[in-house]
Amino acid sequence: MAFRGPEPWVSASLLRQRLKAEEKTLDLEFEVLSVGFNEAGRYALRLSAENPLQVGSGAGVQLQVNDGDPFPACSAITDVIEQQEPGQSLTLTRSKFIFTLPKGFCKNDGQHDAQLHVEALRLDEPLGRAAQRVGEAIFPIYPRPDQPRMNPKAQDHEDLYRYCGNLALLRASTDPTARHCGSLAYSVAFHVHRGPQPPVSDSPPRAGQPELMSPEEPLIASQSTEPEIGHLSPSKKETIMVTLHGATNLPACKDGSEPWPYVVVKSTSEEKNNQSSKAVTSVTSEPTRAPIWGDTVNVEIQAEDAGQEDVILKVVDNRKKQELLSYKIPIKYLRVFHPYHFELVKPTESGKADEATAKTQLYATVVRKSSFIPRYIGCNHMALEIFLRGVNEPLANNPNPIVVIARVVPNYKEFKVSQANRDLASVGLPITPLSFPIPSMMNFDVPRVSQNGCPQLSKPGGPPEQPLWNQSFLFQGRDGATSFSEDTALVLEYYSSTSMKGSQPWTLNQPLGISVLPLKSRLYQKMLTGKGLDGLHVERLPIMDTSLKTINDEAPTVALSFQLLSSERPENFLTPNNSKALPTLDPKILDKKLRTIQESWSKDTVSSTMDLSTSTPREAEEEPLVPEMSHDTEMNNYRRAMQKMAEDILSLRRQASILEGENRILRSRLAQQEEEEGQGKASEAQNTVSMKQKLLLSELDMKKLRDRVQHLQNELIRKNDREKELLLLYQAQQPQAALLKQYQGKLQKMKALEETVRHQEKVIEKMERVLEDRLQDRSKPPPLNRQQGKPYTGFPMLSASGLPLGSMGENLPVELYSVLLAENAKLRTELDKNRHQQAPIILQQQALPDLLSGTSDKFNLLAKLEHAQSRILSLESQLEDSARRWGREKQDLATRLQEQEKGFRHPSNSIIIEQPSALTHSMDLKQPSELEPLLPSSDSKLNKPLSPQKETANSQQT
């Protein structure tokens, strides 16, 4: 199955928006359902989560095999299967692998290609040789190919994809004709990390007498008896932690049948009150007299009752509910936090402990825990905590789980000599035989200084391909664990768990390997300089003197962490999570120290063996099984303590001399630095002056810029004010424009009136012509006179003086004729004047809005406008009066014409009486010529002839 790119039906941007895989922690569940190979042999599969486009992509990946605990690893190996018939499908025990991929492992940006690399390893090579890689397959994790499709909209509780399929294992060969070497069937699921789910039980474990429990009930009870991470008991209480390893030569049941044993641990108060205990181990898988349990149970008691309480261990048969053995250990004899590895021996009723049938042993480790760590005089720290994580690389030749024995030895050289001499106290796990009834409390005594340390046993680490322990060891300051010196070291011994089976479970065979971590003073100083916890983390501590090999044919390494505890009640013990936050020890320093240890290991062992070969071997044979506290032993212990003190004093002197040399070097460096600082002060002063000048110039520039900005702001404000004034002026001109339109309408009306006046003038002219014709007709003489040769005219005949004659030839009144002529001339002149002034008046009105340049001009124009309005009103009234007068005159003229036509003649005196009014009227008609020029909106020909109106107009103009 080759990867062909991201899903074609979902764009990369949309997929990134929906899924956002780079921001989430994802789980890949890959289960191998079956596997088959085309050739017979022993095979194993190695599964690795990797990103070939990124270097170190496996960092941060967590792995969980089957239902085990997760541990940091990006690859795992299945159990070994033997292919006898080619092509046959086989199943695996370690078949389910859950890879927890950290944030950023899966991305869809073209730079990441998360995949699962499956390799087929052939293990037919001799033991110790590297496995041969014969086949491989690639499973794309993310991005996915188009088939089967992934669900990018999946919620946290849903799977991105889940299906079953087959993978072909292609041969890992350069031959192009090579084909696949086998295939495997798998089931895969990919989803967001959900964390560990708590186990769901149908019913809680029953609390009752152990004799009434079924075989399954002790199994349920043992699940709640896992050891806690902390080493302290609850407040005002003490905890007795008992690890039941196994037993040999258990007695048979009363009916002679093989027992089906399990162990119940309780206190004497619980036994007295007939209380059931929850500290129950599991039941063996089959009836046996040599059971192996490996379970740890805890019993809590009140701290004030520790002097009167005993811990009781009962071996019970599950079928018969029969008590097989019972042991009672006084708690007051146990030293706090010291691990006791007991071989509990109980003789038969005959009391013959030397008989073979009487040797019934129960192997257990007992630790008494308090709510605080006791402080000892002369110790700066309470304890040293060691957290052992596991093997870093998968192993190729380890078939069984591994147990670890950890100890802190004060003198590593002497410890190597003891191991070379096969000293029982330095090899394996020292056993303390404890027979019952207990003969003396000295069996629980612990020496003040132990050359071999206080060894502690771990639980079996699995799986065999890559053991993982995640176990913490606590070493007290009383044992010398916190006194870092040149010879102190942490020693880890690795044993196969199969060496604990059989009739003698504590007869450990040759160790699989050993790891040594020197606890020197420099390491102590480095621990105290860290932040947070006073500890360090060692990533790769090698396993020396071992036949174990990794799948890369290299020596295996383990990861561990350690810290110093300075408080009686520490709050934080080391865990798999917080141990990662500790500072990592420099691998170069560690390799340098370990190289010296590796080189000196064989030399010291050989030399110590040759030196001690000349001594009599009787000393080893004469050592009793039970330790004796004799005077010579005490003297030897004191001598060793004095020797250690002398060595410490010498080491302190060496350190003091080294520190003095370092101080001299530091003083010289300080003096040199002061000289350099004195020389650099001048340059610094110059730099300061130049910087001040630059700062001053920059401040001046800033000031200019501020002034410029202020000026521009003022200009902007003025512009805004000018804009507001123009807007207000425009708003003020709107009503003036309306008034102007109104005035223009009035002018049009005046024009209409002018047209009417012109029409009246034409009518008057016609009437004058008709009147002249009539007058001429009337002025004709009678026919008699015609015969005399006098011509006839329509108008009166003119006399010698130029005046018209009457009908009878007499002269007409001079005043009447002059009045008519004057009125006619006046009307004609006024009409001509209006025609000449009409055009400039209109142009001047149209140009008025352009002259509004200021406030004072505006007020002047408004005043003139008011004056023009009043003038227009006066002219309109004059026009109306003139029209009425002209109408009356017209009517009078028409009446006279009719009277003349009818032959009515007015007496001469009547005409003379009217002459003054006519003269007055003629004088009034001459007055408009003396008026000033009118405004553009006025009409000059419509002025009234009355003198009061003239005075009013003159006063308004001034």
Curated annotation (Swiss-Prot):
GO annotations of cellular component type:
peroxisome
Reply yes or no: does the keyword Nucleotide-binding apply: no
SUPFAM superfamilies in the cross-refs: C2 domain (Calcium/lipid-binding domain, CaLB) (SSF49562)
Q: Which residues fall in a compositionally biased region of kind Polar residues?
A: 602-617, 907-920, 949-958
Q: Which domain of life is it from?
A: Eukaryota
Is Secreted set as a keyword in this record?
A: no
Q: Which residues form a coiled coil?
A: 632-774, 859-899
Question: What does the UniProt keyword field contain?
Answer: Coiled coil
Query: Taking every annotated instance into account, which residue ranges of this chain make up the domain C2?
Result: 214-353
Q: Annotated region Disordered: where?
A: 602-628, 899-958
Q: Which PANTHER family match?
A: COILED-COIL DOMAIN-CONTAINING PROTEIN 33, SPERIOLIN-BINDING FACTOR
Name it. Coiled-coil domain-containing protein 33
